């Protein structure tokens, strides 16, 4: 109704076409968020929209996230896929040169567009789509730096959501059935997340088995005008 965006079956279900008015709003939001992440010590990077399938084999996405990925395309005998997440590309940037512990923490951020297969029945406006741009970030740090970096990230997210006036709840999502890594590593990571939240007086709920295949996570659930919760940052 506001002529901000549309979808078109010729383009494909779950893919958003941004109209001029919507593009203005999106650009203003991205400018604000870019200023915010730079203020919080992040550096900007860019990674390709598609990558060699081998990258997603190494990262574990093909084994653990394949049902949410689009199919492979073959070019000159090599297989490529649209990226479902930005993390493999950020890790490749980190690994592109020798690093010292003195360089850490390194905080990388990207407005990265990703593509995920969602069943047509669960697509919902702009809230559940097949292609979307994340204000994504990855922090490379030593184990000793983890608590401080989690705290800094909590500050960043709170500042952003408070600026936009979103009430939110926090959920600590734990190890899913299908997961990489030793269970004791998961327990350690989950304990650090819980400890930092408690130290900062942040109320949270436990989402048993709701973590990503590669690690536990904090889910910020945004609450809309009629009380529904939506996946946030």
Where is each model-derived feature located?
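Active-site proximal loops enriched in glycine and acidic residues that flank catalytic Cys/His/Asp
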Residues: 49, 84-86, 113, 136, ...
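Conserved alpha/beta enzyme-core scaffolds, especially Rossmann-like or related mixed alpha/beta domains
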Residues: 4-20, 128-184, 208
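Surface-exposed charge patches
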Residues: 35, 159, 195
């Amino acid at each position: 109704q506001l002529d901000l965006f549309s979808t078109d079956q010729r383009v494909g279900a779950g893919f958003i076409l941004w109209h001029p008015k919507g593009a203005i709003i999106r650009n203003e939001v991205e400018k604000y968020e870019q200023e915010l992440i730079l203020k919080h010590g992040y550096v900007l990077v860019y990674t390709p929209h598609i990558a060699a399938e081998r990258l997603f084999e190494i990262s574990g996405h093909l084994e653990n996230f394949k049902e949410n990925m689009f199919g492979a395309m073959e070019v000159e005998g090599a297989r490529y896929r649209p990226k479902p997440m930005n993390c493999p590309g950020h890790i490749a940037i980190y690994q592109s040169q020798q690093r010292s512990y003195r360089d850490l923490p390194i905080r990388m951020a990207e407005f990265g567009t990703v593509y995920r297969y969602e069943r047509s029945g669960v697509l919902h406006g702009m809230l559940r789509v097949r292609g979307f741009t994340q204000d994504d970030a990855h922090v490379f740090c030593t184990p000793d730096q983890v608590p401080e970096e989690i705290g800094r990230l909590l500050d960043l997210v709170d500042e952003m959501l408070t600026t936009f006036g979103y009430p939110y709840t926090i959920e600590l999502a734990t190890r899913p059935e299908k997961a990489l890594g030793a269970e004791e590593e998961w327990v350690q990571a989950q304990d650090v997340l819980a400890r930092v939240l408690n130290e900062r007086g942040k109320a949270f709920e436990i989402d048993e088995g709701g973590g990503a295949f590669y690690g536990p996570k904090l889910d910020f659930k945004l609450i809309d005008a009629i009380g529904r919760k939506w996946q946030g940052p």
